Swiss-Prot record:
Its EC number is 3.6.1.1. Keywords: Cytoplasm, Hydrolase, Magnesium, Metal-binding, Stress response. GO terms for molecular function: inorganic diphosphate phosphatase activity; magnesium ion binding. It comes from Encephalitozoon cuniculi (strain GB-M1) (Microsporidian parasite). The gene is IPP1. This is Inorganic pyrophosphatase.
Length: 277
């Protein structure tokens, strides 16, 4: 795999905070430039980490800005933080995205009956190492679950880093139940309830909340990759910035200078539990 790094700009937990992904010192798009597949094995995929495990800040690939830096989601002018759903702290896993995938909002997913959420496929990585914002790695596909978030299809792909010490033991979704007992159940609980402390209703799941296996999930990823291929070659979907360093319509990568600034203060909710009935 090529060597990827990051450049950090602005104070973490502030609206100005951005993390750019670089390759050989050149800014690249984590949405468009990083190959989803690095080999012929479709069960191994590239992952861009957005949110480290136990983090509360909601960081995500920005679709609208040039080269799609990772930024903190902003709600009503303020950086967004998820609450701690007891007994969990922030996000349970390393949370990220599959590059070169796209959940098409113009099509109804045939498995869920809902339209895509206009984002790359989401990933939950269950390995033992806490990953950094913008870290790029290779992972084994294990399975998936279909969240329906405010009426939109939002697949969550379960993976493990190929270099994780447990990777040889975990090859499909049922192996997760054996090695990390209770994790899949807690994952369901978290996704169902994480928006409740903000006054929103509980989320629902398609397919009766059933985890789908690796074979099925490889097909979901393939479809999302094909959606991205259509989108990147289309003149529509103008809300998505398609500037990149390696594909068609090449543009000069910007010069971004690393800023090593202290983090912004986080809100008190980051240190509190929310109890869900």
């Amino acid at each position: 795999m090529p060597a990827y790094s990051t450049v950090r700009v602005g104070k973490k937990y502030s609206p100005s905070f951005k993390v750019y992904v670089t390759q050989d010192g050149k800014i690249v798009s984590p949405f468009h430039d990083i190959p989803l597949y690095m080999s012929g094995n479709r069960e191994i995929v590239s992952v861009v980490n957005e949110i480290p495990r136990f983090e509360n800040g909601k960081f995500e690939i920005n679709k609208e800005e040039a080269f799609n830096p990772i930024k903190q989601d902003i709600k009503k002018g303020w950086p967004r933080f998820v609450k701690n759903v007891f007994p969990m702290k922030g996000y349970l896993w390393n949370y990220g995205a599959l590059p070169q995938t796209w959940e098409n909002p113009h099509e109804v997913d045939r498995h869920t009956g809902a339209r895509g959420d206009n984002d790359p496929l989401d990933v939950i990585e269950i390995g033992r190492k806490r990953k950094e914002v913008g870290e790029v790695y290779q992972a084994k596909v294990l399975g998936s679950i279909a969240l329906v978030d405010e009426g939109e299809c939002d697949w969550k792909v379960v993976v493990i880093d190929v270099n994780d010490e447990k990777a040889k033991e975990i090859n499909d979704i049922e192996d997760v139940r054996k090695v990390y007992e209770g994790l899949l159940e807690q994952t369901i609980f978290w996704f169902k309830n994480y928006k409740v402390p903000d006054g929103k209703p509980k989320n629902n799941f398609a397919l009766d909340g059933k985890y789908m296996d690796k074979k099925f999930t490889v097909g979901i990823i393939k479809s999302a990759y094909e959606n991205w291929c259509g989108m990147i070659n289309s003149k529509s979907d103008t809300n998505i910035c398609k500037e990149n360093s390696t594909l068609m319509d090449k543009v000069d990568s910007p010069a971004i200078i690393q800023e090593d600034l202290s983090d912004e203060e986080v809100p008190e909710c980051v240190h509190q539990f929310e109890f869900i009935k």
